[in-house]
Amino acid sequence: MNRILSGSCLVFLLIFGLSCSKTKEKLTEFDIDYTNTLTVPASSYTVDVPAEFLTPEIPTESESKFSAQKTAKDHIDEIKMTRFNISVSSGDLSVLKSIDIYLKSTGQSDVLIASKSNIGSGVTSTSADLKDVNIKNYIFNDKIQFKVRLLIGGGSSFNQQIKMDQTIHVKAKLIK
């Protein structure tokens, strides 16, 4: 009886052990940086009324960037914005009451990805507050664009080139 019980346990452990020896998928994580500039002419807004501006389209180059990391579009789990810095080379950002940044891409709805309000006096650079949004379907497209909604307060005129630096973080499985 003990032999049968021992044999049954051995067979069970062998079958269970083999079924659990599934190969784990190898994962990778990496960052991609983008930079673009938005021109805000002084004549294009009214004080205390939101004004919207579009950046030029930005090539994502996602296929080549994924390939360089040994992954592909169908292996991507998530892509999230991890940094969105806003800066000006002359003057400052203090005339801005708030800024909302939306991501645009063909076939996708505009999505709010970052915002900033209460920008201090004399500030020439600030980090936007990021939203927790998976933007992988936007980055899969060939080009992205930002729609920027500014609320400009009173004071001096705001005629600026706003530099925007972004970092996205990609989580993916490696191609076997």
What are these regions (language model features)?
Residues V40-D77:
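Post-signal-peptide N-terminal segment of Sec-exported extracytoplasmic proteins
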Residues F16-S19:
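C-terminal motif of bacterial Sec signal peptides marking the signal peptidase cleavage site
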Residues L93-S109:
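Short, surface-exposed beta-strand/strand-loop-strand elements in extracellular ectodomains
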Residues S87-K97, G154-S157:
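Extended, low-complexity, turn-rich repeat/linker tracts enriched in Gly/Pro/Ser/Thr and Asp/Glu
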Residues D77-G91:
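A short beta-strand element within beta-rich, extracytoplasmic domains
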Residues M1-C9:
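Bacterial N-terminal signal peptides that target proteins for export
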Residues T126-T167:
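Cysteine-clustered segments with highest specificity for TGF-beta superfamily mature ligands
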Residues S21-K24:
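Bacterial signal peptide processing site
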